[in-house]
């Protein structure tokens, strides 16, 4: 509490207000909780994975948590700072549909080449299925990661080149909102 570094400076609050959908009081509340859980101001992959394990106790969220961690860690320093955490949280919980889709696209585009390949999507969908474990019963046509990926590509890959551009991803998500709901695991009730 008496440490200067543990308190947000007014200019940091102003910057976060400008780059997120949170109010000043919300930013300060989130910061208080973040500093409580991460006294050094850095959220590690291990800590991030533990958070996911609390929400998905019946599956193995480690692979998916790693993918999400990599998107939260904007500067790729191996840690999530409070600013990185709050900006990602802002998009995923309060962002527009298009902002959420851009964020999701970055999550699925594992090699950051501007396309989502079948293999990348299979990696993500497999991680999601492992994370939810047996807690979700899926219809026969989507009960394996491979079937799910095939269905998504059938709907989204308009030019049939086995990779999705952001435009294809965006249009496909608008045509079939259930695809993005199943993929993002974002709380759409907070949009």
UniProtKB/Swiss-Prot annotation:
> Where is it located?
Perikaryon; Cell projection; Cell projection, Growth cone
Biological process terms from the Gene Ontology for this record are: nervous system development
The chain's disulfide connectivity reads none
Q: Which residues are noted in the entry as Ca(2+) 3-binding?
A: 157, 159, 161, 163, 168
A Pfam family reported for this protein in Swiss-Prot or TrEMBL: EF-hand_7
The lipid of kind N-myristoyl glycine is covalently joined to 2
Residues bound to Ca(2+) 1 are 73, 75, 77, 84
Alphabetically sorted, this entry's keywords are: Calcium, Cell projection, Lipoprotein, Metal-binding, Myristate, Neurogenesis, Repeat
> Which is a Gene Ontology cellular component entry for this protein?
growth cone
Q: Could you share any additional remarks the record makes about this protein?
A: Binds 3 calcium ions via the second, third and fourth EF-hand.
Family the entry assigns: Belongs to the recoverin family.
Q: What is this protein called?
A: Neuronal calcium sensor 1
Q: What is the lineage of its organism?
A: Eukaryota, Metazoa, Spiralia, Lophotrochozoa, Mollusca
């Amino acid at each position: 509490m008496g440490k200067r570094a543990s308190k947000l400076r007014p200019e940091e609050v102003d910057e976060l207000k400008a780059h997120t959908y949170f109010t000043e009081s919300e930013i300060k509340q989130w910061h208080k909780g973040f500093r409580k859980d991460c006294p050094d101001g850095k959220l590690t992959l291990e800590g991030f994975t533990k958070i996911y394990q609390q929400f998905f106790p019946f599956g193995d969220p480690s692979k998916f948590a790693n993918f999400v961690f990599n998107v939260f860690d904007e500067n790729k320093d191996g840690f999530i700072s409070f600013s990185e955490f709050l900006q990602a949280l802002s998009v995923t919980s309060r962002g527009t549909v298009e902002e959420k889709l851009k964020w999701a696209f970055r999550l699925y585009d594992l090699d950051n080449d501007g396309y989502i390949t079948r293999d990348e999507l299979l990696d993500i969908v497999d991680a999601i299925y492992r994370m939810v474990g047996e807690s979700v019963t899926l219809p026969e046509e989507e009960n394996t990661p491979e079937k799910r990926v095939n269905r998504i590509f059938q709907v989204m890959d308009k030019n049939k080149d086995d990779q999705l551009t952001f435009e294809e991803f965006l249009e496909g998500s608008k045509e079939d909102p259930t695809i993005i709901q199943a993929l993002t695991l974002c709380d759409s009730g907070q949009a």
